[in-house]
Amino acid sequence: MKKYLLLALLPFLYACSNSSNQGINYDEAFAKDTQGLDILTGQFSHNIDRIWGVNELLVASRKDYVKYTDSFYTRSHVSFDEGNIVIETQQDLNRLHNAIVHTLLMGADAKGIDLFASGDVPISSRPFLLGQVVDHQGQQIANQVIASNFATYLIQNKLQTRRLQNGHTVQFVSVPMIANHVEVRARKYLPLIRKAAQRYGIDESLILGIMQTESSFNPYAISYANAIGLMQVVPHTAGRDVFAMKGKGGQPSTRYLYDPANNIDAGVSYLWILQNQYLDGITNPTSKRFAMISAYNSGAGAVLRVFDNDKDTAIYKINQMYPEQVYRILTTVHPSSQARNYLLKVDKAQKKFRVRR
Protein backbone atom coordinates (compact mmCIF):
# COMPACT_ATOMS: atom_id res chain seq x y z
CA MET A 1 0.00 0.00 0.00
CA LYS A 2 2.83 2.41 0.87
CA LYS A 3 4.42 1.78 -2.53
CA TYR A 4 1.15 2.52 -4.31
CA LEU A 5 0.66 5.67 -2.29
CA LEU A 6 4.18 6.75 -3.16
CA LEU A 7 3.35 6.51 -6.85
CA ALA A 8 0.10 8.36 -6.34
CA LEU A 9 1.78 11.21 -4.48
CA LEU A 10 4.76 11.70 -6.78
CA PRO A 11 2.90 13.95 -9.24
CA PHE A 12 1.62 16.21 -6.49
CA LEU A 13 5.00 16.59 -4.86
CA TYR A 14 6.65 17.30 -8.19
CA ALA A 15 3.93 19.80 -9.00
CA CYS A 16 4.67 21.78 -5.86
CA SER A 17 8.04 22.87 -7.20
CA ASN A 18 7.79 22.87 -10.98
CA SER A 19 5.83 26.10 -11.16
CA SER A 20 8.70 28.03 -9.62
CA ASN A 21 11.68 26.12 -11.03
CA GLN A 22 10.91 25.83 -14.71
CA GLY A 23 14.49 26.45 -15.77
CA ILE A 24 15.83 23.53 -13.75
CA ASN A 25 16.64 20.29 -15.53
CA TYR A 26 13.82 17.78 -14.99
CA ASP A 27 16.06 15.13 -13.42
CA GLU A 28 17.51 17.64 -10.97
CA ALA A 29 14.07 18.94 -10.06
CA PHE A 30 12.75 15.42 -9.64
CA ALA A 31 15.64 14.50 -7.34
CA LYS A 32 15.08 17.61 -5.25
CA ASP A 33 11.35 16.91 -4.99
CA THR A 34 11.81 13.35 -3.81
CA GLN A 35 13.84 14.52 -0.80
CA GLY A 36 10.63 15.61 0.87
CA LEU A 37 8.59 12.68 -0.37
CA ASP A 38 9.04 10.52 2.72
CA ILE A 39 7.61 13.28 4.91
CA LEU A 40 4.60 13.94 2.69
CA THR A 41 3.95 10.25 2.12
CA GLY A 42 4.29 9.50 5.81
CA GLN A 43 1.87 12.21 6.88
CA PHE A 44 -0.82 11.39 4.34
CA SER A 45 -0.42 7.63 4.68
CA HIS A 46 -0.50 7.85 8.46
CA ASN A 47 -3.79 9.74 8.37
CA ILE A 48 -5.44 7.27 5.99
CA ASP A 49 -4.08 4.18 7.73
CA ARG A 50 -4.99 5.40 11.20
CA ILE A 51 -8.49 6.59 10.36
CA TRP A 52 -9.64 4.35 7.50
CA GLY A 53 -7.35 1.33 7.68
CA VAL A 54 -4.69 -0.04 5.36
CA ASN A 55 -7.21 -1.44 2.88
CA GLU A 56 -9.16 1.79 2.45
CA LEU A 57 -6.71 3.85 0.42
CA LEU A 58 -8.57 6.19 -1.91
CA VAL A 59 -6.80 8.99 -3.81
CA ALA A 60 -7.61 11.24 -6.74
CA SER A 61 -6.87 9.88 -10.21
CA ARG A 62 -7.69 10.50 -13.87
CA LYS A 63 -11.39 9.79 -13.58
CA ASP A 64 -11.90 10.00 -9.83
CA TYR A 65 -12.22 13.09 -7.66
CA VAL A 66 -11.37 12.31 -4.03
CA LYS A 67 -11.30 14.89 -1.24
CA TYR A 68 -10.80 14.32 2.48
CA THR A 69 -12.20 16.79 5.02
CA ASP A 70 -12.76 16.99 8.80
CA SER A 71 -9.19 16.01 9.65
CA PHE A 72 -9.53 13.11 7.18
CA TYR A 73 -12.56 11.59 8.92
CA THR A 74 -14.88 12.50 6.02
CA ARG A 75 -14.30 11.96 2.33
CA SER A 76 -16.07 12.53 -0.97
CA HIS A 77 -15.52 10.37 -4.04
CA VAL A 78 -16.90 11.27 -7.46
CA SER A 79 -16.38 8.52 -10.04
CA PHE A 80 -16.70 10.32 -13.37
CA ASP A 81 -16.29 7.04 -15.22
CA GLU A 82 -18.97 5.09 -13.34
CA GLY A 83 -21.22 8.09 -12.78
CA ASN A 84 -21.57 7.73 -9.03
CA ILE A 85 -20.89 9.88 -5.96
CA VAL A 86 -20.16 8.42 -2.52
CA ILE A 87 -19.81 10.68 0.50
CA GLU A 88 -18.92 9.05 3.81
CA THR A 89 -17.91 10.01 7.31
CA GLN A 90 -16.80 8.57 10.60
CA GLN A 91 -18.09 11.65 12.40
CA ASP A 92 -21.60 12.90 13.10
CA LEU A 93 -24.31 13.39 10.50
CA ASN A 94 -23.86 17.15 10.52
CA ARG A 95 -20.43 16.61 8.99
CA LEU A 96 -21.91 14.27 6.40
CA HIS A 97 -24.56 16.86 5.57
CA ASN A 98 -21.87 19.51 5.15
CA ALA A 99 -19.76 17.28 2.90
CA ILE A 100 -22.74 16.48 0.68
CA VAL A 101 -23.53 20.16 0.19
CA HIS A 102 -19.93 21.14 -0.53
CA THR A 103 -19.42 18.26 -2.96
CA LEU A 104 -22.59 18.97 -4.92
CA LEU A 105 -21.74 22.67 -5.15
CA MET A 106 -17.98 22.49 -5.78
CA GLY A 107 -16.70 24.53 -8.69
CA ALA A 108 -14.73 23.52 -11.77
CA ASP A 109 -11.56 25.38 -10.78
CA ALA A 110 -9.01 22.81 -9.66
CA LYS A 111 -6.18 25.34 -9.35
CA GLY A 112 -7.01 26.39 -5.81
CA ILE A 113 -7.87 22.97 -4.37
CA ASP A 114 -5.34 21.30 -2.09
CA LEU A 115 -6.18 17.61 -2.23
CA PHE A 116 -3.95 16.91 0.77
CA ALA A 117 -5.48 19.47 3.10
CA SER A 118 -8.57 18.46 5.05
CA GLY A 119 -10.56 21.66 4.68
CA ASP A 120 -13.86 22.01 2.86
CA VAL A 121 -13.94 22.65 -0.87
CA PRO A 122 -15.42 26.12 -1.48
CA ILE A 123 -19.03 26.36 -2.60
CA SER A 124 -19.37 27.79 -6.10
CA SER A 125 -22.14 29.86 -7.63
CA ARG A 126 -21.51 27.80 -10.78
CA PRO A 127 -21.35 24.19 -9.52
CA PHE A 128 -19.39 21.85 -11.73
CA LEU A 129 -21.87 19.01 -11.13
CA LEU A 130 -24.83 21.16 -12.19
CA GLY A 131 -26.83 19.23 -14.76
CA GLN A 132 -25.09 15.95 -13.91
CA VAL A 133 -27.00 15.23 -10.70
CA VAL A 134 -30.63 15.85 -9.77
CA ASP A 135 -32.26 15.75 -6.35
CA HIS A 136 -35.05 13.48 -5.13
CA GLN A 137 -37.60 15.71 -6.86
CA GLY A 138 -35.77 15.62 -10.17
CA GLN A 139 -34.58 19.22 -10.05
CA GLN A 140 -31.07 20.42 -10.74
CA ILE A 141 -28.92 21.29 -7.75
CA ALA A 142 -28.07 24.89 -8.47
CA ASN A 143 -27.76 26.53 -5.06
CA GLN A 144 -27.18 25.95 -1.37
CA VAL A 145 -30.87 25.71 -0.43
CA ILE A 146 -31.54 22.90 -2.91
CA ALA A 147 -28.30 21.14 -2.00
CA SER A 148 -29.05 21.36 1.73
CA ASN A 149 -32.58 20.03 1.31
CA PHE A 150 -31.27 17.16 -0.81
CA ALA A 151 -28.58 16.37 1.77
CA THR A 152 -31.26 16.21 4.47
CA TYR A 153 -33.36 13.90 2.31
CA LEU A 154 -30.40 11.60 1.64
CA ILE A 155 -29.51 11.32 5.31
CA GLN A 156 -33.10 10.66 6.34
CA ASN A 157 -33.91 8.19 3.56
CA LYS A 158 -30.74 6.82 1.95
CA LEU A 159 -28.23 6.61 4.78
CA GLN A 160 -26.13 3.43 4.87
CA THR A 161 -23.64 2.10 7.39
CA ARG A 162 -20.59 -0.10 7.05
CA ARG A 163 -17.84 -1.23 9.39
CA LEU A 164 -14.19 -0.94 8.46
CA GLN A 165 -11.66 -3.66 9.17
CA ASN A 166 -10.18 -1.45 11.89
CA GLY A 167 -13.55 -1.50 13.67
CA HIS A 168 -14.56 2.06 12.84
CA THR A 169 -18.14 2.70 11.72
CA VAL A 170 -18.77 4.67 8.54
CA GLN A 171 -22.04 6.33 7.58
CA PHE A 172 -22.43 7.15 3.91
CA VAL A 173 -24.76 8.02 1.06
CA SER A 174 -24.48 7.13 -2.60
CA VAL A 175 -25.81 9.45 -5.30
CA PRO A 176 -26.08 8.29 -8.92
CA MET A 177 -25.38 10.77 -11.68
CA ILE A 178 -27.79 11.10 -14.61
CA ALA A 179 -27.46 8.68 -17.52
CA ASN A 180 -25.80 11.15 -19.92
CA HIS A 181 -23.51 12.80 -17.38
CA VAL A 182 -20.49 12.38 -19.67
CA GLU A 183 -22.15 14.32 -22.48
CA VAL A 184 -23.22 17.05 -20.05
CA ARG A 185 -19.61 17.50 -18.94
CA ALA A 186 -18.39 17.46 -22.52
CA ARG A 187 -20.74 20.29 -23.44
CA LYS A 188 -19.20 22.47 -20.73
CA TYR A 189 -15.94 22.48 -22.66
CA LEU A 190 -17.22 22.67 -26.25
CA PRO A 191 -16.45 26.40 -26.70
CA LEU A 192 -12.83 25.84 -25.65
CA ILE A 193 -12.57 22.68 -27.74
CA ARG A 194 -13.93 24.40 -30.85
CA LYS A 195 -11.57 27.32 -30.41
CA ALA A 196 -8.55 25.01 -30.17
CA ALA A 197 -9.78 22.81 -33.03
CA GLN A 198 -10.02 25.81 -35.34
CA ARG A 199 -6.72 27.27 -34.21
CA TYR A 200 -4.70 24.10 -34.77
CA GLY A 201 -6.68 22.37 -37.49
CA ILE A 202 -7.52 19.31 -35.40
CA ASP A 203 -10.84 17.46 -35.69
CA GLU A 204 -13.23 18.39 -32.88
CA SER A 205 -14.39 14.81 -32.47
CA LEU A 206 -10.80 13.62 -32.03
CA ILE A 207 -10.26 16.11 -29.20
CA LEU A 208 -13.48 14.98 -27.54
CA GLY A 209 -12.59 11.31 -27.95
CA ILE A 210 -9.16 11.80 -26.39
CA MET A 211 -10.55 13.92 -23.56
CA GLN A 212 -13.19 11.33 -22.67
CA THR A 213 -10.62 8.53 -22.71
CA GLU A 214 -8.05 10.51 -20.73
CA SER A 215 -10.18 12.02 -17.98
CA SER A 216 -13.89 11.53 -18.66
CA PHE A 217 -13.98 15.35 -18.63
CA ASN A 218 -12.77 15.54 -15.04
CA PRO A 219 -11.06 18.93 -14.52
CA TYR A 220 -9.35 17.62 -11.35
CA ALA A 221 -7.73 14.70 -13.17
CA ILE A 222 -4.20 13.62 -12.31
CA SER A 223 -2.35 10.36 -12.92
CA TYR A 224 0.57 8.56 -11.28
CA ALA A 225 2.62 9.59 -14.35
CA ASN A 226 2.04 13.28 -13.52
CA ALA A 227 -0.41 13.78 -16.37
CA ILE A 228 -2.55 16.80 -15.50
CA GLY A 229 -6.09 17.91 -16.22
CA LEU A 230 -8.70 17.28 -18.88
CA MET A 231 -6.32 16.14 -21.62
CA GLN A 232 -3.77 14.63 -19.21
CA VAL A 233 -0.81 16.69 -20.35
CA VAL A 234 2.53 15.60 -18.87
CA PRO A 235 4.46 18.80 -18.06
CA HIS A 236 8.02 17.56 -18.69
CA THR A 237 7.27 15.81 -22.02
CA ALA A 238 4.29 17.03 -24.04
CA GLY A 239 4.13 20.23 -22.00
CA ARG A 240 7.76 21.02 -22.70
CA ASP A 241 7.25 20.36 -26.44
CA VAL A 242 4.25 22.67 -26.50
CA PHE A 243 6.08 25.46 -24.71
CA ALA A 244 9.00 25.12 -27.13
CA MET A 245 6.61 25.37 -30.08
CA LYS A 246 5.22 28.57 -28.59
CA GLY A 247 8.70 29.99 -28.05
CA LYS A 248 8.59 29.58 -24.28
CA GLY A 249 11.26 28.06 -22.09
CA GLY A 250 10.77 25.37 -19.47
CA GLN A 251 7.49 23.57 -18.99
CA PRO A 252 3.94 24.38 -17.83
CA SER A 253 3.22 24.29 -14.13
CA THR A 254 0.50 22.17 -12.60
CA ARG A 255 -1.49 25.30 -11.83
CA TYR A 256 -1.23 26.33 -15.49
CA LEU A 257 -2.46 22.94 -16.68
CA TYR A 258 -5.35 22.85 -14.22
CA ASP A 259 -6.83 25.80 -16.07
CA PRO A 260 -9.21 24.18 -18.62
CA ALA A 261 -8.41 26.69 -21.37
CA ASN A 262 -4.66 26.18 -20.95
CA ASN A 263 -5.01 22.42 -20.69
CA ILE A 264 -7.11 22.05 -23.82
CA ASP A 265 -4.84 24.41 -25.75
CA ALA A 266 -1.76 22.45 -24.63
CA GLY A 267 -3.32 19.08 -25.46
CA VAL A 268 -4.46 20.18 -28.90
CA SER A 269 -1.11 21.91 -29.52
CA TYR A 270 0.57 18.58 -28.87
CA LEU A 271 -1.76 16.89 -31.35
CA TRP A 272 -0.67 19.53 -33.88
CA ILE A 273 2.98 18.70 -33.15
CA LEU A 274 2.29 15.01 -33.68
CA GLN A 275 0.39 15.70 -36.89
CA ASN A 276 2.74 18.23 -38.46
CA GLN A 277 6.16 17.38 -37.06
CA TYR A 278 6.70 13.93 -35.56
CA LEU A 279 4.32 12.06 -37.90
CA ASP A 280 4.32 14.52 -40.79
CA GLY A 281 5.51 12.00 -43.39
CA ILE A 282 2.44 9.78 -43.09
CA THR A 283 0.35 10.58 -46.15
CA ASN A 284 -2.98 8.85 -45.55
CA PRO A 285 -5.11 11.02 -43.19
CA THR A 286 -6.75 8.02 -41.53
CA SER A 287 -3.45 6.22 -40.98
CA LYS A 288 -2.00 9.44 -39.56
CA ARG A 289 -4.99 9.80 -37.22
CA PHE A 290 -4.46 6.28 -35.88
CA ALA A 291 -0.76 7.01 -35.37
CA MET A 292 -1.54 10.34 -33.67
CA ILE A 293 -3.95 8.71 -31.23
CA SER A 294 -1.48 6.00 -30.31
CA ALA A 295 1.36 8.53 -30.05
CA TYR A 296 -0.65 10.77 -27.74
CA ASN A 297 -0.56 7.88 -25.28
CA SER A 298 2.83 6.28 -25.85
CA GLY A 299 4.88 8.82 -27.82
CA ALA A 300 5.62 9.13 -31.52
CA GLY A 301 8.89 7.23 -31.25
CA ALA A 302 7.19 4.21 -29.70
CA VAL A 303 4.55 4.22 -32.44
CA LEU A 304 7.09 4.36 -35.28
CA ARG A 305 9.23 1.62 -33.70
CA VAL A 306 6.26 -0.73 -33.98
CA PHE A 307 6.90 -0.62 -37.74
CA ASP A 308 10.68 -0.14 -37.85
CA ASN A 309 13.50 1.16 -35.67
CA ASP A 310 14.39 3.68 -38.36
CA LYS A 311 11.94 6.59 -38.49
CA ASP A 312 12.01 7.09 -42.25
CA THR A 313 11.64 3.37 -42.91
CA ALA A 314 8.74 3.17 -40.45
CA ILE A 315 6.91 6.01 -42.18
CA TYR A 316 7.59 4.41 -45.57
CA LYS A 317 6.11 1.11 -44.36
CA ILE A 318 3.04 2.87 -42.95
CA ASN A 319 2.51 4.61 -46.28
CA GLN A 320 2.52 1.25 -48.06
CA MET A 321 -0.34 -0.01 -45.90
CA TYR A 322 -4.08 0.48 -45.87
CA PRO A 323 -5.35 2.37 -42.80
CA GLU A 324 -7.03 -0.82 -41.59
CA GLN A 325 -3.64 -2.54 -41.53
CA VAL A 326 -2.08 0.31 -39.55
CA TYR A 327 -4.96 0.15 -37.07
CA ARG A 328 -4.65 -3.63 -36.68
CA ILE A 329 -0.91 -3.46 -36.09
CA LEU A 330 -1.16 -0.65 -33.53
CA THR A 331 -3.93 -2.45 -31.65
CA THR A 332 -2.27 -5.87 -31.66
CA VAL A 333 1.51 -5.50 -32.04
CA HIS A 334 2.35 -2.36 -30.04
CA PRO A 335 4.39 -3.59 -27.04
CA SER A 336 2.31 -1.53 -24.61
CA SER A 337 -1.06 -3.06 -23.76
CA GLN A 338 -2.18 0.36 -22.56
CA ALA A 339 -1.37 1.88 -25.95
CA ARG A 340 -3.14 -0.96 -27.77
CA ASN A 341 -6.30 -0.44 -25.75
CA TYR A 342 -5.99 3.33 -25.93
CA LEU A 343 -6.39 3.44 -29.71
CA LEU A 344 -9.42 1.16 -29.48
CA LYS A 345 -11.05 3.38 -26.85
CA VAL A 346 -10.33 6.74 -28.49
CA ASP A 347 -11.41 5.55 -31.93
CA LYS A 348 -14.69 4.28 -30.48
CA ALA A 349 -15.27 7.50 -28.53
CA GLN A 350 -14.44 9.67 -31.53
CA LYS A 351 -16.96 7.84 -33.69
CA LYS A 352 -19.60 8.40 -31.01
CA PHE A 353 -18.96 12.14 -30.95
CA ARG A 354 -18.99 12.31 -34.75
CA VAL A 355 -22.48 10.81 -34.78
CA ARG A 356 -23.76 13.26 -32.14
CA ARG A 357 -22.47 16.41 -33.81
UniProtKB/Swiss-Prot annotation:
InterPro entries in alphabetical order: Lysozyme-like_dom_sf, Murein_transglycosylaseC, Murein_transglycosylaseC_N, Transglyc_AS, Transglycosylase_SLT_dom_1
Primary localisation category: membrane
Keywords of this entry: Cell outer membrane, Cell wall biogenesis/degradation, Lipoprotein, Lyase, Membrane, Palmitate, Signal
One Gene Ontology term, aspect cellular component: cell outer membrane
Keyword Membrane: yes
Signal sequence annotation: 1-15
Pfam families linked to this entry: Mltc_N, SLT
One Gene Ontology MF term: hydrolase activity, acting on glycosyl bonds
Lipid group attachment sites (S-diacylglycerol cysteine): 16
Protein's job: Murein-degrading enzyme. May play a role in recycling of muropeptides during cell elongation and/or cell division.
Listed name of the protein: Membrane-bound lytic murein transglycosylase C
Native source species: Haemophilus influenzae (strain PittGG)
Gene: mltC
